[in-house]
Each structure stands twice: as C-alpha cells, then as structure tokens.
C-alpha cells in the first residue's frame, strides 16, 4: 500500500512512500 504524499504519485513501486 502506498501513502499519498504531496508531489508524490501512488504507483506500484511508490518510490516516494516508505513501505
């Protein structure tokens, strides 16, 4: 699951969001 962040897109890898 990816967390929604400003300037960050929710993708399959979610590089901006910590897992």
UniProtKB/Swiss-Prot annotation:
UniProt GO MF annotations: toxin activity
GO cellular component, one term: extracellular region
Disulfide bonds: 2-16, 3-14, 8-17
Tissue: Expressed by the venom duct.
Keywords: Cleavage on pair of basic residues, Disulfide bond, Secreted, Toxin
Cell compartment(s), UniProt: Secreted
Keyword check for Secreted: yes
Note: The precursor sequence of reg3l described in Franco et al., 2017 corresponds to the precursor of conotoxin reg12l (AC A0A2I6EDL5).
Entry's free-text remark on domains: The cysteine framework is III (CC-C-C-CC).
Family: Belongs to the conotoxin M superfamily.
Protein name as it appears in the record: Conotoxin reg3l
Source organism of this protein record: Conus regius
């Amino acid at each position: 699951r990816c967390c929604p962040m400003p300037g960050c897109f929710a993708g399959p890898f979610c590089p901006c969001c910590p897992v």
